[in-house]
């Protein structure tokens, strides 16, 4: 099975074509392949009984090889008398039935409907050298003559590189003239060219254009074939254009990668599809580092299913770190997509082999090593496919990672980010079937741990009385992992969670074992409206947490939405937490100017602001207080240290963990005002 490449890169294709033809000159037309590479397509669309017209035969051996394999009724024409004379002398004795005539293909003298096949190897490309009006007029006459001399049901079979203006012309002209149009990518020709021109990284894909003539067609018939796979049928010419263009663009990417090192530039990203499928089967990130002694040349790393969301595989910085540890100059990082079936790692390698080879540096002769985390492709089980009016399609999945079973909530609008994750434990019950249980002591998102320290600070250090319940507001529920942890670890906390999406509450209860009781309840409401109502009704909380993501992925700040940092909302929070309370938010910001603006807004409202930046993630936890004593980082560290140690004790006392949850000293060293 072949994989159809679709690149996300943009290139100036015209410059590339110009370089290709300038470099090769007259030898450019050797690129179209000989009989051996083309025979599969020739025998598929041309039969020995056909009356064949060879358009612009030149000195090509194609018609001779066809004659020798049983195609006897072949008429060759060429505008050059020298070429015709030479071919007659060469074939008179050995191929007596084959005809060679000097004739202009744009003004042929044959009667109407003389042939059942018109074969064109590169002649169209030679005629259509540019897109000037005079050239287009010549090409239009060429095709009118082909159709005039062709019987109904006959076929034009053209071997072409399909430059953009040629493709556009064919897609416009042929359907209008009642021709069924099929375009097939000739992988055999392309592979042979690469082998014959191993030192030349400048390559182009070759296509077979098959246009079948009908008296009339009620609707256009447009098809594309990738190699020897079944045809993909389209309803519009733009879809067929896109299929051809995607192959050409991918070739340009592969050529660029063969000719140059992209160290210091962005990664190159390529999706691999099965023909006729719109969703990718694989995504490949290609990254380079400068040549250095001791580095391997090139390797591919296959990410097991379910692991693609981890930082080291899902971010450019993480993949750079992976490349450093792999110790290769070029690394192709391959991720496997959900809703696809993969059997064994060896079969995945075999399926990827040609695509991975196409991305290699020029001149590479060594076998390409395949790296992974184990000997299989990983395990991913979809528990449910759902839809949210707010967040769109989502999945609940279980994956195996490092010997653990993890249950995840994934939004398909941003499917390389885990929205919620829980550790699933298997509970063995004597005489009964094993039961799965969510481990509430597992915090998948590291930022939840640092928010929990803040809650510990607000509910114990700030308010030491143990017999009084402290109120905590969490805006943003998701799968409920943070709320379940706080509820289990901090018995003094009375938690209110606000979630705008009712589907998320169902997901949290049914798949993440979220349970409401007298110390924990969920309100379905807009978080901003709820905050405003609390302020208006004089409702106070000891801790307020914003753990909300933005649905607009185009912005440089994905958490929280910018509306949550409006001065009016922050003023409401200031009043709600009172003199002793704490406000915490998870800030995820790639745009430094937006981050600065967010921090400035917080400083304008709150007397004391402190932050902790997670080492590998871009998450940053911001702590805000009204208490003047927190104006120094020393005071923050003193009380956060007490809170951190208290949280470690709490998780052990409640049997959520047997070890400390937080490295207190490390955490305190990175706290900043």
UniProtKB/Swiss-Prot annotation:
Disulfide bonds: none
Keyword terms: Methyltransferase, Multifunctional enzyme, Transferase
Major enzyme class: transferase
Gene Ontology biological-process annotations: methylation
GO MF, any single term: protein-lysine N-methyltransferase activity
Enzyme Commission code: 2.1.1.-
Pfam families: Methyltransf_31 (PF13847), Spermine_synth (PF01564)
Annotated catalysed reactions: L-lysyl-[protein] + S-adenosyl-L-methionine = N(6)-methyl-L-lysyl-[protein] + S-adenosyl-L-homocysteine + H(+); N(6)-methyl-L-lysyl-[protein] + S-adenosyl-L-methionine = N(6),N(6)-dimethyl-L-lysyl-[protein] + S-adenosyl-L-homocysteine + H(+); N-terminal glycyl-L-lysyl-L-glutamyl-[protein] + 3 S-adenosyl-L-methionine = N-terminal N,N,N-trimethyl-glycyl-L-lysyl-L-glutamyl-[protein] + 3 S-adenosyl-L-homocysteine + 3 H(+)
InterPro entries assigned: Lys/N-term_MeTrsfase_sf, Methyltranfer_dom, SAM-dependent_MTases_sf
Similarity section: Belongs to the methyltransferase superfamily.
Function field: Dual methyltransferase. It catalyzes N-terminal methylation of target proteins via its C-terminus. It catalyzes dimethylation on lysine residues of target proteins via its N-terminus.
Name of the protein in its database record: eEF1A lysine and N-terminal methyltransferase homolog
Native source organism of the sequence: Drosophila melanogaster (Fruit fly)
